[in-house]
C-alpha cells in the first residue's frame, strides 16, 4: 500500500521480517532495505521501527542498496543494530541482525548508535531438535537489555557506540577493533587461514 495512506493509521510502532534475498538490479523494490524504507515511511514521526534482516543488508553491497541506506538516513534515524546468533534461523543459512530506527526524524551527523554483538545469546543447536535455550539465555537477554537502555556499560567486544556514515557496514564487526594481543594458537590459526585463502585465490587464477 501507499506509505502516505498507511501513515494515516497513525502507527507508532512498526515491526518487520521482510522477504530475504529477493532483490536485484531488475527488482530493487525487493531488497530488504527497500521494505524497511517503506515501513519507516508508513509510520508517524517519532515512531519506533524494529526489523530483523540478513546482516548482508546492512553492508550496502550493491549501488541500489547503498542508495537505500543513504535515503533512509535522510528521513529517518538509525538507533542501533544487534548482530544475532548465526543459528537463529537454524537450517536456513542466513545470519540475521535486528535494526532499530526512529521514523520521520533525519539522522543527525553526531548521532551515536549502538552496535551489539549478541551472537552468543544462550541458545545452542541440539541434534535432531534444532535451537534450544540454555540456562544462560535469560541472563544474556537481560544483559542485552541493560546495555541497550544504558543501565550498564559494556566492553567494546559486546557493544560499540559510534557515529555512522551511510557507506559504513552497519554491524558490530565493522566498528569493533580488537586490541587484545592474540595468543600463539590464535596467531597461528589466523596465518593458516590467510595462507589457505591466498592459495585458493591463486588456484582460481
Give a label for each model feature.
Residues 5-8, 12-205:
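A conserved structural/catalytic subdomain of Rossmann-like adenosyl-cofactor enzymes
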Residues 1-2:
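Conserved SAM-binding strand-loop segment of SAM-dependent methyltransferases
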Amino acid at each position: 500500500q501507499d506509505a502516505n495512506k498507511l501513515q494515516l493509521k497513525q502507527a507508532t510502532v512498526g515491526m518487520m521480517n521482510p522477504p530475504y534475498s529477493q532483490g536485484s538490479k531488475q527488482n530493487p523494490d525487493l531488497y530488504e532495505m527497500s521494505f524497511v524504507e517503506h515501513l519507516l515511511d508508513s509510520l508517524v514521526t517519532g515512531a519506533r521501527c524494529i526489523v530483523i534482516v540478513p546482516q548482508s543488508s546492512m553492508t550496502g553491497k550493491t549501488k541500489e542498496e547503498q542508495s537505500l541506506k543513504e535515503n533512509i538516513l535522510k528521513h529517518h534515524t538509525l538507533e542501533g543494530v544487534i548482530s544475532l546468533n548465526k543459528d537463529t534461523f537454524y537450517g536456513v543459512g542466513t545470519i540475521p541482525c535486528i535494526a532499530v530506527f526512529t521514523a520521520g526524524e533525519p539522522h543527525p551527523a553526531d548521532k551515536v548508535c549502538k552496535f551489539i554483538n549478541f551472537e552468543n545469546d544462550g541458545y545452542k543447536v541440539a541434534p535432531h531438535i534444532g535451537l534450544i535455550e540454555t540456562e544462560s539465555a535469560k541472563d544474556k537477554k537481560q544483559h542485552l537489555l541493560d546495555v541497550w537502555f544504558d543501565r550498564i556499560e559494556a566492553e567494546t567486544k559486546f557493544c560499540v557506540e559510534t557515529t555512522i556514515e551511510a557507506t559504513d557496514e552497519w554491524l558490530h564487526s565493522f566498528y569493533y577493533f580488537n586490541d587484545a594481543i592474540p595468543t600463539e594458537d590464535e596467531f597461528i590459526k589466523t596465518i593458516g587461514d590467510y595462507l589457505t585463502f591466498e592459495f585458493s585465490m591463486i588456484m582460481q587464477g
